[in-house]
Amino acid sequence: MSTYLDLRGKSIDLSVLAPEDLLLFQQLQADVVRLDSAAYRNHWVTQVSNLLSRRGLSKAAIVGSSLYRLAQDLGSRQQVQRGEARVPDYRDELEGIVLGQFKTRRAFCEATGLSEDMLSHVLARRKHLAIDTLTEALGRVGYRLTITPLSK
C-alpha cells in the first residue's frame, strides 16, 4: 500500500485512486513546481472537478475525495515552501474545535477550564499551552492529543 502523508500528518491511501486519478495526481505534482500559487489553485480545482464530475460525483463528493485532498495539499506545501503560508500546528486544530463546536470562546473556556485570556494568547500565537494542560482541557470536551509523523 502506498500512502501520502499530508501537512497535518494524515495519511491518504494512494492505492484507492483510480488509474486516471493517479495519473492526474502525478501531473499535478509536476504542475505545482512550474505554476505560481494562484495559477496552481485554479488549475488543480478545474482539473480535479472536471475529472470527477464526469463520473457523476456531486460537488460535496468531489471535495471529500482523496484526489481533491491530495491536490489541495500540494498547493499548501507550495505556499509553505514559498513563504506564503505557515505549516499548521495544534493551535489551528484547537481553533477549529472552538469555532466548530462552541458558540463562543467563553463557552469553550467554561467547558475546558482554560482562561479566556490564555486561549486568546494561544490562538494569537503568542503563547503555548503545556502538554498536560492541553491534554486535560481537550479531554473535558471529548478530544485527545495525538502524535503524528512529520510530513516530508
Language-model features and meaning:
Residues 1-90:
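N-terminal flexible/basic segments that precede or flank functional cores
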